[in-house]
């Protein structure tokens, strides 16, 4: 190894130069040591606990306590826990507090638990017998945060819906005062009064159970030693009258404690517990002030609400009528104000009455032309009323017109009428034509009791129109087999009609089973292969033929193979066990079941694709999926239409049908599913339509719930109707698509598989193969009806008066759009899946009501044909026009956007105008929800919208591991100088789905997935609609980590990003996976070329705290799945990454100009692709230098050049054999660093 002192100094410089200051999110204070460690004890007891699973806690020098519990449980009637506790008498009053930091938590197991607990009885240390005791606790249970207690039965109250994940910190406390208990988590409080919960001793402490590793710090126990003999309460300054649902206000209440020594002390709110408050019902409400065993009562008066104002928010969908029409209130929404603004709410229909001309509006028929007022009167306070006007035209009805007849015009005796598809219009004397609702006309004349032509008449307002239908008697068409016996036989077997059912078939589709029929199997020859006719006869009918097959018995050869991406001989293999079972292994990271391709261990046999089969086996799951799962692990039975080359780790795709353990995504449930992939036309995944799945059992399979601990027998079958899956003897589920495996090969490869992380043991295998030619014919199920819906896609908040209302139906139909009472469009045809836009002018600084009426076209197969009425309000507002909008962490929606009265961030984003700047004042903007810049919230090329830090500040938008990060779907935004931190698990810190955006001088860290990612934020499959022409400039991304520790990159432009996206002058380091990820999926298709210019990637794969990830760990990952995309990377540096510095990741078309790589663990440069793919790499001016013996560089098809210094395993040389010296390397490095520093 060469002398590298100079390089070490330079590397230190690089690390200091490129590492910006660390997160501005406030750090937690040092833990407060437990004052008397001898008072604390530890016990692990209860079901499923053991020395191995529940080791003694680690007591740290700072007083923190780490408890690791891989055994135990919190169940409905037992507790098995690791418990660090102290003892106090049951009559003691005290408070225990602690911070619980999650180091590991199995989020899919409801019996995993941790937190604070007070327990009545504890089990003997290291006794694993079942234990059940009264207790009260606050912490994790049922995968979320709860307050819960055991007293006869387990009672649970949700506190936080958050599932704990690695790095989360929960501030917990339990305060006991007499029989009252106050439980708190992160500021959320629950109070319980529980007499008799404890007997003699209370065991107070911290605990963990099942699969949790928790660090408890600031553990503090405070015992109240004062002897209170009485309380006095002064109500003179306290509010004692409340409206319904008004919160308790203790301001002005004086509570004084009197002690046994004769002294007295006025208490604070923290010193006493208030119980019994309930303002939900008018009347007297008695509350108790509790301190220890002493309590005082206070009577409060709860006053009923009084309606003081009504407002019509949305007019009815119909406000224009003709004489003789009935009033229709559909769509009407009324807002009530109670007690002069105390409460404002939308009323239900029973809370108000409608009157027209002094009469109830229900079924009111308009008999007078002109304008009429509809009164809206409060039923709660009839003196409060409002109203609106409707218009009645004096035009008279002239005729009815059938614009479309019903779909069904032929009937059988006894059929009910079906008017689906009938469209009727009324014509009026003013030339208008109005479509009638089904409720507006009557239909008479249908009679199916006798055959013949029937005239059906439509009636409306005294006018009629008629159409004809035909009624006939049903006729027997013949007989058919409705249940099939065995139809495939091996030589030597005899025909068996068991299970055969024959039915009469009528022309209306009815079937009636026959009991009297004969079967003639004389032509069947069980000694000779062939297809034979079995004749079925019944009196009065022509005989029918049941075909059966006789074939040679085939001994199917079983084989083992591993193939596909991420597989290897060390991770993917098959073992044949002494007990006759087959063990199929995919160790962690060994393969995957991805949306469009697979990498699997496969134990299989081959059958003819024309045949059907049933394959069953008992499955023992020894290991499956880490926690949390990463979405690509799977096991079970699989059938596929092609397999890869043995031992080849290239991308390989086929159509599949499978049953077994599967999730399909980190956010999807992981259970036993039937799933299929369709549309794949070639091994590269072209044409893939992705994976569809049906959940059979929503429980993660593992050693405890699979064979032999529990029955777990999987069955996968192919029939002429489709692919069928079944667990044990449960209900069959089916995909009615039998031909999906007839694409790539004339064979079906069927067997048992494992991927990513799964080890299974397969036994009692049963395979039955039959001839599809003679099996039961294909059943095509009726098409499932579509539930009609209408999306309103446009903004509900805007700063523009010129507005476009955008709607998108999922079925064909017609829409009418109203703005208030004004009709903007009427009965316009809209198509399923297509957007339709209606222009409107908004009233400035007001709320603008819209009503959209959608009538589905009833010629479609729908679950409902009722019209859909959607009310939608658009708030138009501006702030500080002509100036900047200021926001602060303490800003509110009621600010005016000035520096002295700032807005909150969401309001500013919703109402910023084109060309206007949102200025973020300094501070931490802590959130528990996503920050969304919606589609259509756009700037323009000339006037962007700005979201920038106040000069001299560094604001932090902290999602607190609860919010889903930033979603930027708008266009032409400029975002600068802001930190984006700690998004929720499996969500990027910042995702760009819009176009022409610039993000500059921002940092992304500690997020639950990639720091910043460019990918679509909707469901568009068209690359033209994917995010394009976005620039990321001088940004830094680090310490991003997903729960599975294998997916969070620093920056990404992958999967579904368009053209023209650029990263300039950015730095990515210490991310759990890659620095940059430009992954492309074959099934989704090529993404747009990305430019990476003057960027740096270092130390990726390891976090700043030393945590080593389980992902790829590359610096720049520049593609995926062999899809050619001409990404350009230039003037960039990669060093000290956990894997490869610059990798094409199978993309055969990367262009790399003037880049430097140094000491990357698995190579500085790896530009390769899969076998059979022609490469078109361009590598020019590449400098690769290594002092730690990494693998040699690889660039397939790149001719040697004097401009490239590639590492050959020992030294860096160019085409002429000139070796790059350390001095020359440093000079080139400094030159490039200088160039990167100049980026602005």
From Swiss-Prot:
Residues the record lists as binding Ca(2+): 325, 349-350, 1049, 1073-1074, 1077
GO BP annotations, alphabetical order: symbiont-mediated disruption of host cell wall
Cofactor dependence: Ca(2+)
Catalytic reaction(s) noted: Eliminative cleavage of (1->4)-alpha-D-galacturonan to give oligosaccharides with 4-deoxy-alpha-D-galact-4-enuronosyl groups at their non-reducing ends
InterPro entries from the UniProt entry: Ig-like_bact, Pectin_lyas_fold, Pectin_lyase_fold/virulence, Polysaccharide_Lyase_9
EC number: 4.2.2.2
The organism's place on the tree of life at top rank: Bacteria
UniProt-recorded Gene Ontology molecular function terms: metal ion binding; pectate lyase activity
Description of how activity is regulated: Inhibited by the metal chelator ethylenediaminetetraacetic acid (EDTA).
Region (Has catalytic activity): 27-551, 545-1240
Keyword terms, alphabetized: Calcium, Lyase, Metal-binding, Secreted, Signal
Induction profile: Appears to be constitutively expressed in various carbon sources.
Intracellular or extracellular location(s): Secreted
Temperature-dependence annotation: Optimum temperature is 65 degrees Celsius.
pH dependence as annotated: Optimum pH is 7.
GO cellular component, one term: extracellular region
Residues spanning the signal sequence: 1-26
UniProt keyword Calcium present: yes
EC class: lyase
Function summary: Cleaves polygalacturonate or partially methylated pectin. When assayed on polygalacturonate or on pectin, it releases monogalacturonate as the principal product.
Family: Belongs to the polysaccharide lyase 9 family.
Name of the protein described by the UniProt record: Pectate lyase L
Protein's organism: Thermoclostridium stercorarium (Clostridium stercorarium)
Species classification: Bacteria, Bacillati, Bacillota, Clostridia, Eubacteriales
